[in-house]
Amino acid sequence: MRQRPKEQDKIERRHNFNPVEENLTPEQVKEEASRCLSCKNPRCVKGCPVNIHIPDFIKALKEDKLDEAGEIIRQTSMLPSVCGRVCPQERQCEGQCVLGIKGESIAIGALERYVGDNTAAKPVEITPTGKKVAIIGSGCAGITAASDLRKAGHDVTIFEALHQFGGVLRYGIPPFRLPRTVLDREIETLKAMGVKFEKNVVVGKSITLKELKDDGFDAIFICSGAGLPKMMNIAGENLNGVFSANEFLTRVNLMHANEESSATPLRVGKSVAVIGGGNVAMDAARTAVRVGFEKVYIVYRRTEAELPARLEEIRHAKEEGVIFQFLHAPCEILGKDGYVSGMKFEIMELGEPDESGRRKPVGTGRYATLDVDTVIVALGTGPNPIIQKSAKTEGLDFETDKKGYFTVNEETRETSIPTIFAGGDVAPVGTSNAINAMGAGKKAAKAINEYLESLK
């Protein structure tokens, strides 16, 4: 039987930001590891974007070799404690596990998290190459690339636009899913390796790509994320009480705007509608519960079966009292005296599948309203063009797609301008999540290292 971690009481956790799940116990780890079949052709490894040697680290756990398990994971993943908590394992490694065909897959994520939390990265002997790499952004892609490039001996500097490091791991994912102590430990590991960190540096404003090159950086990896929110473009979006999920989560996670002592306090109303069905929508809704909204709705234009969020996130949201309104498409945000007073929706039904493979919502001509005083829009984000615009004034004209994302070689992550690479949410390939960003960081680091090696 699959082992499951103990969870914080669903009523208590509505009122705090403490982690919802505990680690598995050592006994549970041993029991879960014993279920692994040690397949000769492990599908789970193919399902992992960074190709962690999953059967090998689980075998080490079977043999009570915890430190060895940590070494195996860290051969390919810098962030086991992070990935064990936030990666969509049910759609990746665990989704490929043969045991899941007729029963329950191995709890790979929980095992990885346990190993990450209970082992430390060993010191690495660095042989300096004299080459310099600039990494723009300190999220998953940047941290991963920095680790690999530093191990190869290169002088690595990470430039972060905000005042704390971690990117979306810091400002986007709430601490009840990813404790800040976990993220801080990973950052400190990089610093101990000799990676340099510069905060409050907006590349394209504070410094340009050309200036970085002039400062002696031999290669640049752009992984600054996608920070521009996608809005609904409906009437009422300019009313007070309308937030993008990006703003709402950043204000709570990074600026602590929910606390009384905050210099920029968050206005908490009675009821909020969160528009969207992904993990960000779940994070926003569950955060809204914790900051004090009495009623929290998630409004989604399809049915529960089409929700793209992790199953665990959906379950936790329901347990915490979030109300789901399915087959509702926003039409208008209603207002009174400049503030949100409600929302109008069209009732939908499902038609034929669209390009995503999900059945397309079709309007019925019937309408409904919700009494809410706050709206949080969680419909995704797009790239900020500041780097491209700044570069263009210096004669660096990047190729981008129609949405503004960098066009890159999928294997090397190199942009249309030689020696400049891009990955993560600024040049997404596949679903946008932590582990895919890490995969992009590894590809970029490999290509950058090969280029720098060729200069010798």
Q: Model regions: which residues?
A:
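Rossmann-like dinucleotide-binding cores of NAD(P)H-dependent redox enzymes
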Residues: 158, 162-193, 197, 285-332
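FAD-site-proximal beta/loop scaffold in flavoenzymes
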Residues: 238-269, 353-430
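N-terminal Rossmann-like FAD-binding beta1-loop-alpha1 element of flavoenzymes
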Residues: 132-157, 281-289
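A conserved FAD-binding loop/helix module that cradles the flavin
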Residues: 426-455
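Feature captures the FAD/FMN-dependent oxidoreductase FAD-binding
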Residues: 68, 127-128, 132-136, 184-234, ...
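Iron-sulfur cluster-binding cysteine motifs and their immediate structural context
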Residues: 38-63, 82-115, 157, 161-164, ...
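Glycine-rich dinucleotide-binding loop and its adjacent helix/turn
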Residues: 112-127, 185-205, 229-291, 400-411
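Ferredoxin-type iron-sulfur electron-transfer modules in oxidoreductases and energy-metabolism complexes
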Residues: 13-32, 53-85, 102-125, 252-253
